[in-house]
C-alpha cells in the first residue's frame, strides 16, 4: 500500500490584451503577490530559526492503540497555532512579541496566505535543522548546510482561488485569484489555457485534490494542481512466489531509449522498442554549437549562465522524450495487472574521452536514463505496478538463451566488426544472434530470478580463531 502523486499544469493566458490575454497590471499583481509572500515566509523562517528549540519539543498524548501515555514530536498544526499566538495581533492575544509583530509588518494579509507561509517556513526550518544535525554527527568541516531560503512557489489554499473552466465547448475560461495589488488584497480574474486533457485529469475519479501552487516565471505563469491516490500493491516477495508472475524488464540505451520485454512462465511473450527518433543526433548538434559559443566567449563569468535559451530547449527535449518513453513503459505494464517492473541498478556512468560536445551529449543521455526510470516508476505505481532494480552485471555480455559469455559486433560495409559498442550480440556456444539491447533486456529477467551467474553472493562465515 502506498500513495501515488501526479501534477497537472494549467497555464495562465498572459498574452496581449487584444489577443484575449491578461493585461499588464494583472501580471504585475502576480509579481507583487509572490514578492509579499516571500517576505512573509522570510519573516517566519527567521522566527523559527530564532526559536529552534520549539521545533524539537516533545508533547505527551494518550495513545488509543496502546492505552497509555506516550510522547511524540510537536506537529506542524501545533507549531502554527503557537506561532500565530505570539506573532499575530487578535482579540484573544492582543499583544504579540514586540520584535515579531507580523500584523504590524503585513497588515490586512489574508489569514489563509499567512498560514500557507507559516507551513512552508516550518518545513524549510525543520529540513535545515535535520541536515545540520546530520552534518554535526559526521564531524566534517566541509559540507555545512546553508540557512534556508525564503523563496518558494506560493500554495493557494481554499479561500484564495476559484476555478471555473466551464464546459468543453466554451472558449471563456477563467480562474479567480486573491492577489496583492501593492496597496490591498482583492479578487482578480485571469484567463487560462484550459483543455480536455486538464479537465479529464482534474475530474478523474479516485484522485484526491491538493492545494495548487502558483508557478510564476519570466514570461509565463502556471497553476500546478497536485493529486494523490492510495494504491494497493503486493510486496515483491509475495509476487515472486506466484509461478505465473509477469515481469516487465526495461533496458535503457542511447538510440533505443527503452527495450521492453515481457516474460511469463520462462518465455518472452512481448517485446517493444522505443527509439529516440533522432533525439541523440539532434541534441549533439545543439551541444556542439554550445561548446563552440562557450569557446568563443572565453572564460565564463562566475554567477552568469550563458546560452540559456538553447540549454532550456535541450532540457525540454529530454524531459519530453523521458515522459513519452515512460508512458510507453507504463502502457505495457497496464496490459498485465499485478506485474513487476524491472530496471537495471545503474548509478554513476561517467563520459570519458572524445570531444567536449560528445562528452556533454553522453552526460545528457545518462541523465535521460535516470529521468525515464523515475517517470516510469511513478506512472507504473499509479497503476499498482511495483518497480524493482536488479543487478546489472553482465546483462550485455552474457547470452540470454544459454548463459554463456558472448561478444558484441556490428556490420560495417558487410564486414563483421567486434566491438564493445556493437549493435548485435553473438554467442559462441549456442550460436545465438540477436539485437544487443534485446539480449540485455532479456537478461534483466534472469537477474531478477537469480538465474545462471546472477546468483546471490553468500556471506563469508567468520572462521574460529584457535585459542592459545
Summary of predicted features, one role per range:
Residues 4-6, 221-468:
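Positively charged, helix-rich recognition surfaces that bind polyanionic ligands
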Residues 11, 164, 178, 213-215, ...:
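Residues in well-ordered beta-strands of folded domains
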Residues 4-21, 184-196, 272-276, 403:
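Generic detection of short hydrophobic beta-strand segments and adjacent strand-loop junctions
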Residues 41, 48, 125, 129-132, ...:
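A generic secondary-structure signal for well-formed alpha-helical elements
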Residues 7-9, 158-160, 172-176, 220-222, ...:
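Broad gene-expression machinery/nucleic-acid interaction feature
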Residues 70-217, 272, 362, 366:
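Acidic carboxylate diad motif detector
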Residues 1-120, 133, 295-304, 310, ...:
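Long, compositionally biased intrinsically disordered regions
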Residues 31, 92, 125, 330, ...:
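Short glycine-/small-residue-rich flexible loop motifs, especially phosphate/cofactor-binding loops
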Amino acid at each position: 500500500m502506498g500513495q501515488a502523486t501526479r501534477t497537472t499544469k494549467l497555464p495562465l493566458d498572459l498574452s496581449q490584451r487584444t489577443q484575449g490575454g491578461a493585461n499588464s497590471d494583472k501580471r504585475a499583481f502576480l509579481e507583487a503577490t509572490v514578492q509579499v509572500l516571500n517576505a512573509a515566509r522570510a519573516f517566519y523562517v527567521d522566527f523559527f530559526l530564532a526559536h529552534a528549540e520549539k521545533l524539537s519539543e516533545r508533547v505527551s498524548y494518550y495513545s488509543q492503540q496502546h492505552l497509555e501515555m506516550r510522547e511524540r514530536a510537536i506537529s506542524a498544526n501545533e507549531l502554527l497555532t503557537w506561532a500565530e499566538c505570539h506573532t499575530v495581533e487578535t482579540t484573544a492575544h492582543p499583544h504579540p512579541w514586540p520584535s515579531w509583530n507580523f500584523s504590524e509588518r503585513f497588515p490586512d494579509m489574508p489569514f489563509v496566505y499567512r498560514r500557507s507561509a507559516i507551513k512552508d517556513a516550518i518545513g524549510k526550518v525543520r529540513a535545515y535543522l535535520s541536515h545540520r544535525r546530520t552534518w554535526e554527527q559526521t564531524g566534517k568541516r566541509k559540507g555545512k548546510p546553508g540557512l534556508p531560503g525564503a523563496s518558494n512557489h506560493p500554495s493557494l489554499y481554499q479561500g484564495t482561488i476559484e476555478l471555473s473552466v466551464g464546459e468543453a465547448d466554451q472558449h471563456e475560461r477563467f480562474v479567480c485569484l486573491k492577489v496583492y495589488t501593492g496597496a490591498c488584497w482583492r479578487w482578480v480574474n485571469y484567463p487560462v489555457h484550459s483543455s480536455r486533457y486538464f479537465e479529464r485529469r482534474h475530474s478523474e475519479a479516485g484522485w484526491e485534490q491538493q492545494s495548487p501552487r502558483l508557478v510564476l516565471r519570466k514570461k509565463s505563469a502556471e497553476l500546478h494542481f497536485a493529486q494523490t491516490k492510495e494504491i494497493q500493491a503486493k510486496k515483491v516477495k509475495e509476487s515472486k512466489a506466484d509461478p505465473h508472475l509477469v515481469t516487465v524488464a526495461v533496458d535503457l540505451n542511447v538510440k533505443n531509449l527503452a527495450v521492453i520485454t515481457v516474460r511469463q512462465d520462462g518465455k518472452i511473450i512481448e517485446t517493444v522498442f522505443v527509439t529516440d527518433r533522432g533525439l541523440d543526433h539532434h541534441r549533439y548538434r545543439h551541444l556542439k554549437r554550445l561548446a563552440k559559443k562557450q569557446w568563443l566567449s572565453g572564460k565564463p563569468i562566475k554567477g552568469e549562465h550563458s546560452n540559456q535559451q538553447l540549454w532550456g530547449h535541450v532540457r525540454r527535449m529530454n524531459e519530453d522524450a523521458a515522459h513519452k518513453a515512460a508512458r510507453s513503459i507504463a502502457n505495457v505494464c497496464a496490459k498485465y495487472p499485478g506485474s513487476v517492473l524491472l530496471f537495471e541498478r545503474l548509478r554513476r556512468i561517467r563520459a570519458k574521452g572524445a570531444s567536449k560536445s560528445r562528452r556533454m551529449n553522453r552526460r545528457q543521455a545518462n541523465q535521460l536514463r535516470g529521468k525515464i526510470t523515475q517517470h516510469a516508476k511513478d506512472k507504473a505505481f499509479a497503476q499498482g505496478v511495483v518497480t524493482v532494480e536488479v543487478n546489472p552485471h553482465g546483462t550485455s555480455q552474457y547470452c540470454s538463451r544459454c548463459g554463456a559469455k558472448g561478444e558484441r559486433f556490428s556490420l560495417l560495409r558487410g564486414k563483421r566488426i567486434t566491438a564493445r559498442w556493437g549493435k548485435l550480440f553473438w554467442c559462441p556456444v549456442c550460436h545465438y544472434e540477436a539485437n544487443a539491447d534485446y539480449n540485455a533486456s532479456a537478461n534483466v529477467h534472469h537477474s531478477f530470478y537469480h538465474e545462471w551467474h546472477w546468483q546471490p553472493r553468500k556471506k563469508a562465515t567468520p572462521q574460529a580463531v584457535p585459542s592459545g
